[in-house]
Structure formats: structure tokens, C-alpha cells
């Protein structure tokens, strides 16, 4: 039953799984065992949607499930192993936008399922449901930035990507120490310990990347929160497009492991 009802998402799952296994084999022979470990982690993450559906009896629409699968593949295999983060400057931005959308979908689903449960005395209006969905997504985004910052500080990673800027403003440059920002414009060269970095500008160490990530996470969260608000307020009134992105509880009489 599950595969028959989710033909498109199952096909995507199979294709992505085959690609990940192929990459894992290739990286194994190349001696890149860190990439092999990342492939194994990706294979486990690709199982997450199916695990949620079977374990918690939640019906994930095929469209949402495909987005989750593609997101995992794009982030881990394309982004990390294939270096798409470096090849395509917008790659990180696109993924953080998707993350905001997906996190909002998760937050919305959790509360909406409680709203509709007969065993829980809990009910929120469509507006508050959308607000909770938005706040959940933004919290996930902020916690992720905390994680990136911690990895950079404790282990010397560069998860908060750097950016080259050509102007800065800082009160630390104020010779009078009067808390007045001093502006430096048209920066084309920066030297560290007497050595030119050759960047053509000033190196910003993560602030711009962090703020861009949170801004696009905000956009993704707003988009799904609006979708969720419209869906709940007009539930059952022909909103078939929106329903493709909103999880719902499975019926109790269904065999969750049947293939036909």
C-alpha cells in the first residue's frame, strides 16, 4: 500500500539511494573515508521520511517527501562531497531557504496533529498555528547557526563561510574611544602579518553568511506558515495544491508495511 500510494517519492528515493551508494564506492576506492562515512549518514537520512510515516503513523504527502529527499541529497552529496557550496555560491542560500520551509512544515504538522487529536485537549487558531510554525522554523535555524559557530570555535572548521567585503564600519577604530563608528570604504587589499591575502577586499569571517542564512530561513518559514494558515482556515475546501505539502495522520485501519 505504501509504495503504491507514493510511487513518485519511492522512485526518487531509489534513484538517490543508488547514486549515494555509487558515490560511496567511488570514494572508498579513492581513499576518502570521511566521504564514505558521509554517504552512510546520507543513506540513513534518506530513510527518515519512511521512518516517520511508519513509526508515528503520519502521512507525508509525496511532494513534501520528495523535497525532503532532494534536500538531504543536495546538502550532503552535492554540497559537501561534490563541493557545490564552492562551485555555486547560491547553493547554501537555496538549501537554507528549503530548510526554513521544511522546518516550518515539521513545526506546523506537530501542532496541527495535536490540534486534531481526540486524546489531547489542545487547540490553536489558524493564526497562532502559523505563528508557532514560523517560530519553530526560526528556532531550528538559530540552533543550527549556534552549531556552526561552535564547530568553528572549538574545532577550527569553517562552517560559517567567509565573505569578501569592500567597506567596514567599527567603533574599535575610533581613536577617541567615543563609541563612534569609523568607516573605511573602497578596500581592495588586506595584509595579515605583513602578507597580502590576495582577496581584493576585507575578509568577513562568517557574519554575512550567518545573517544571509537566517534571512532566507525566515523567507522559507514565512512561505510555509502562510500556506499552513490558509490550509487550516479553509480545511476541506478544495485546496488540493496546499494539501500536497501538509502532513496528516494516517487512518488506524491501514497496514503500514503492505506493498500492494
Residue ranges: model-predicted function:
Residues 1-16:
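N-terminal membrane topogenic signal
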Residues 3-4, 52-63, 119-124:
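Membrane-interface helix-boundary motifs at transmembrane edges
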Residues 28-33, 55-58, 81-91:
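Membrane-interface helix caps and helix-loop-helix hairpins in membrane proteins
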Residues 40, 59-70, 93-96:
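Cytoplasmic-side transmembrane-helix entry/capping segments in multi-pass membrane proteins
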Residues 46-50, 71-76, 133, 137-144, ...:
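Alpha-helical transmembrane segments of multi-pass membrane proteins
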Residues 81-92, 138-224:
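Interfacial helix-loop-helix junctions of multi-pass membrane proteins
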Residues 98-115, 153-159, 219-233:
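Membrane-interfacial alpha-helical segments at the cytosolic side of multi-pass membrane proteins
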Residues 238-259:
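Short, highly charged, low-complexity non-transmembrane loops/tails of multi-pass membrane proteins
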Amino acid at each position: 500500500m505504501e509504495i503504491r500510494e507514493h510511487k513518485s517519492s519511492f522512485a526518487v528515493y531509489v534513484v538517490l539511494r543508488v547514486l549515494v551508494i555509487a558515490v560511496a564506492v567511488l570514494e572508498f576506492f579513492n581513499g576518502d573515508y570521511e566521504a564514505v562515512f558521509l554517504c552512510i549518514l546520507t543513506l540513513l537520512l534518506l530513510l527518515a521520511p519512511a521512518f516517520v510515516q511508519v513509526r508515528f503513523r503520519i502521512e507525508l504527502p509525496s511532494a513534501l517527501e520528495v523535497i525532503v529527499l532532494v534536500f538531504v541529497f543536495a546538502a550532503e552529496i552535492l554540497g559537501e562531497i561534490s563541493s557545490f557550496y564552492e562551485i555555486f555560491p547560491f547553493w547554501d542560500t537555496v538549501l537554507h531557504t528549503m530548510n526554513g520551509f521544511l522546518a516550518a512544515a515539521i513545526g506546523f504538522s506537530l501542532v496541527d496533529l495535536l490540534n486534531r487529536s481526540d486524546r489531547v485537549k489542545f487547540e490553536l487558531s489558524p493564526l497562532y498555528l502559523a505563528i508557532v510554525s514560523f517560530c519553530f522554523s526560526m528556532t531550528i535555524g538559530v540552533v543550527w547557526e549556534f552549531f556552526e559557530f561552535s564547530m568553528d570555535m572549538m574545532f577550527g572548521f569553517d562552517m560559517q563561510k567567509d565573505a569578501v567585503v569592500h567597506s567596514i564600519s567599527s567603533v574599535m577604530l575610533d581613536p577617541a574611544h567615543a563609541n563612534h563608528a569609523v568607516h573605511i570604504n573602497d578596500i581592495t587589499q588586506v595584509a595579515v602579518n605583513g602578507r597580502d591575502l590576495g582577496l581584493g577586499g576585507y575578509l568577513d569571517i562568517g557574519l554575512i553568511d550567518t545573517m544571509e542564512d537566517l534571512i532566507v530561513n525566515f523567507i522559507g518559514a514565512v512561505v510555509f506558515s502562510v500556506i499552513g494558515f490558509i490550509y487550516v482556515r479553509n480545511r476541506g475546501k478544495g485546496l488540493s495544491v496546499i494539501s500536497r505539502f501538509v502532513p496528516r495522520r494516517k487512518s488506524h485501519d491501514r497496514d503500514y508495511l503492505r506493498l500492494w
